[in-house]
């Protein structure tokens, strides 16, 4: 799987890499479902490969121009809210995805700008490897 996301801001320029892999540990926040929280001791491992594709301007539905960071995510695990946490949590990028109502802020009319760009799987009947690709419209 590959995902494209727009992060609601720009990463600090110092020591920023263009790509890498992060491992974060999260568990359900039982007092604030469905929110997930960092827990290095009891959390489940979430491994995500990422690449910064660039910084650009995004015009939201209110007409406000925002500086955003376009990121490619390739999750190696399938944890709940894995990519949203890789973006928003301070152990990840520390910048939420545009429109994320759980881990960031959402301005009127915004939607979550996270898109599955590529999904591959083995067909259950033919056994053929299938790959579906669709570029993000944002």
Locations of the language-model features?
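RNA pseudouridine synthases
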Residues: 1-138
């Amino acid at each position: 799987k590959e995902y494209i996301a727009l992060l609601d801001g720009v990463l600090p320029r110092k020591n920023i890499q263009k790509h890498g892999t992060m491992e974060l540990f999260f568990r359900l926040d039982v007092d604030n479902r469905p929110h997930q929280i960092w827990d290095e001791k009891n959390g489940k491992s979430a491994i995500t490969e990422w690449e910064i594709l660039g910084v650009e301007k995004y015009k939201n539905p209110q007409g406000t121009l925002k500086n955003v960071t376009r990121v490619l995510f390739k999750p190696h695990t399938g944890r709940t809210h894995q990519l949203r946490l890789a973006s928003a949590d301070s152990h990840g990028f520390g910048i939420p995805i545009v429109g994320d109502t759980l881990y960031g802020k959402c301005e009127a009319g915004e939607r979550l700008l996270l898109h599955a760009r590529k999904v591959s799987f083995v067909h259950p009947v033919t056994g053929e490897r299938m790959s579906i690709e669709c570029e993000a419209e944002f």
